[in-house]
């Protein structure tokens, strides 16, 4: 095994938590069950890494093999990446093609390798419904940097792809071109939707977040919830009817199901100064006023959902706050109509 491959493997092993080491190595599916049994998972991680390297040397592990381990690690820790959502589209009236995984991978890799001399492209099908793509970028004069790859998660037969942040901005258009052509789409656009929680982004774009409420009877549930609210002796209601109304409006707006997990929402406002009183310095200003408001929380939508019931905000909340899942965006630009 080459020295640079061994070092890449060592660093990959070192970043895996000991509690997940066995699961990740098993999911990697490179070492045999007997080899995995010989690994002492209770020793110091640097010794453990050396033990794994020796086992991989016996099997003549290549760079491609170690890259697959890095993909598996990233799948376990996908929340460590900031994911951007992209939506592709076909020409009007264009037929939907049957998806061929081998053809997709070949086309994607060919486009990148024709444009760039030094690039490493790897694939891993995950849970049969998505393909994970890992791209390590190099330059004309340097080998691909395996420590700063870009990840693409594409769901075949859908127009959606999720791409992690790329440190080389000049490669982004090429990546979009490869994805668009390989998946046989005509156009790709960046949705104003980002998060570290890939599963929540997927739930939003595929509208999976409300599946748990399909058998939900709103009238009955609201009555039961309101009754339990009134019977709770620990809560004092100054206005029971208002509390019931707030509870009803909140459930109508957010539903009873868990909200997708997003960490932030950003609103950019651009507006011209308006006044019924003519003249003045501000009225003559040609440049619009600009304002940036950012909401952040470990679980923003659940936090917004709790505002009105907690008495912090009036119900219903502004549509700008509640439309995030339906609009599929958490970056907004608000301008004069």
UniProtKB/Swiss-Prot annotation:
It comes from the Eukaryota. GO terms for biological process: CENP-A containing chromatin assembly; chromosome segregation. It holds the Pfam family CENP-N. The keyword Nucleus applies. Keywords: Centromere, Chromosome, Kinetochore, Nucleus, Phosphoprotein. Its main location: nucleus. It is found in: Nucleus; Chromosome, Centromere; Chromosome, Centromere, Kinetochore. GO terms for cellular component: inner kinetochore; nucleoplasm; nucleus. The modification Phosphoserine is found at residues 226, 233. Belongs to the CENP-N/CHL4 family. Component of the CENPA-NAC (nucleosome-associated) complex, a complex that plays a central role in assembly of kinetochore proteins, mitotic progression and chromosome segregation. The CENPA-NAC complex recruits the CENPA-CAD (nucleosome distal) complex and may be involved in incorporation of newly synthesized CENPA into centromeres. CENPN is the first protein to bind specifically to CENPA nucleosomes and the direct binding of CENPA nucleosomes by CENPN is required for centromere assembly. Required for chromosome congression and efficiently align the chromosomes on a metaphase plate. Component of the CENPA-NAC complex, at least composed of CENPA, CENPC, CENPH, CENPM, CENPN, CENPT and CENPU. The CENPA-NAC complex interacts with the CENPA-CAD complex, composed of CENPI, CENPK, CENPL, CENPO, CENPP, CENPQ, CENPR and CENPS. Interacts directly with CENPA. Identified in a centromere complex containing histones H2A, H2B and H4, and at least CENPA, CENPB, CENPC, CENPT, CENPN, HJURP, SUPT16H, SSRP1 and RSF1. This is Centromere protein N. The lineage of its organism: Eukaryota, Metazoa, Chordata, Craniata, Vertebrata. The gene is Cenpn.
């Amino acid at each position: 095994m080459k020295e640079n491959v061994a070092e890449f493997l060592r660093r990959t092993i070192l970043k895996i938590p000991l509690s997940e080491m066995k699961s990740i190595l098993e999911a990697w599916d490179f070492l045999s069950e007997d080899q995995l049994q010989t690994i002492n998972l209770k020793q110091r991680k640097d010794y453990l890494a050396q033990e794994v390297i020796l086992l991989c040397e016996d099997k003549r592990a290549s760079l491609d093999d170690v890259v697959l381990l890095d993909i598996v690690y990233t799948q376990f820790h996908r929340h460590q990446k900031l994911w951007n959502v992209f939506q592709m589209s076909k020409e009007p009236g264009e037929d939907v093609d049957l998806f061929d995984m081998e053809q997709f991978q070949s086309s994607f890799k060919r486009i990148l390798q024709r444009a760039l001399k030094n690039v490493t492209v790897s694939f891993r099908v995950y849970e049969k419904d998505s393909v994970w793509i890992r791209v390590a970028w190099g330059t004309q004069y340097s080998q691909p940097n395996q420590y700063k790859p870009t990840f693409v998660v594409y769901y075949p037969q859908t127009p959606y792809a999720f791409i992690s942040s790329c440190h080389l901005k000049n490669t982004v258009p090429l990546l979009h071109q490869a994805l668009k052509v390989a998946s046989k789409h005509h156009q790709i656009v960046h949705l104003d939707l980002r998060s570290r929680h890939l599963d929540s982004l997927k739930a939003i774009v595929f509208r999976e977040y409300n599946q748990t409420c399909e058998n939900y009877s709103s009238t009955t549930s609201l009555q039961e919830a309101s009754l339990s609210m009134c019977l709770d002796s620990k809560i004092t209601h100054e206005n029971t009817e208002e509390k019931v109304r707030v509870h009803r409006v909140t459930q109508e707006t957010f539903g009873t199901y868990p909200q997708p997990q997003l960490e932030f929402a950003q609103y950019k406002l651009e507006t011209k100064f308006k006044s019924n009183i003519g003249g003045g310095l501000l009225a003559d200003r040609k440049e619009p006023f600009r304002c940036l408001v950012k909401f952040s929380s470990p679980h923003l939508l659940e936090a917004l959902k709790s505002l009105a019931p907690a008495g912090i905000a009036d119900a219903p909340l502004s549509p700008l706050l509640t439309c995030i899942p339906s609009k599929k965006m958490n970056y907004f630009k608000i301008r004069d109509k």
